Amino acid sequence: YKISLTSKETQDLFNSDSPLFGQMTDVTVKKDASLSLTDYNEPLLETELVFLVQEDVNGDDTDEEVMRKCLVAPGIEVPDGRYDDWFPKTTFYEVIADGAVNGAVVYGEAKQYSYDDVKNIEAVLYLNDQEVKQGNSEEVLGHPVNSVKWLAKALEERGEKLTAGRFVSSGTFMLPERLEAGKYRVEYENVGDVQLSVKP
């Protein structure tokens, strides 16, 4: 799963007062990877923590229970719309219809972390070793675990569950950047880094 519109800034862009989610396949989720711009329409780049669910997550689980049930990895998401000139012009309902504009998710080493380990942490995005932008985990509904809990509840409302073996790209620390060719790296405080090579 990927979760979008997890900050007030992104919700305002799409006139929404809540997040939304879409489903992703194993094909679109990769460990430290190389991508080609020719495989995408108008891709962006976002900095997100990826939760790998080890044990079923319930909507009423505590923060600590969710963290215990998941491994967390540094991640990069590549949103991509199927419409021309889609960002930020796509509407809220078009984003839903487009599977929350999923393109790809790349993640690094996954480990067990506590709630405090990923609370109020910084992420720094680099392109070709030059700093591009910084962001903070508080942009993700105050804490990324809140995003996972929101998803678990949203699934339960549909009669579904957030089950072991699933992954969750939990929401961006910063507004997205246009993806371009080069070598990207995101360094996350406490969580390590993830790299992505993008070919023209």
Regions found by a protein language model. Give the residues of each.
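Catalytic-core "active-site belt" of small-molecule-metabolizing enzymes
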Residues: 1-142, 180, 193-200
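Active-site proximal loops enriched in glycine and acidic residues that flank catalytic Cys/His/Asp
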Residues: 171-172, 188, 198-200
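A short tyrosine-centered beta-strand micro-motif
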Residues: 184-186
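Extended mid-to-C-terminal alpha-helical interaction segments
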Residues: 155-159, 191
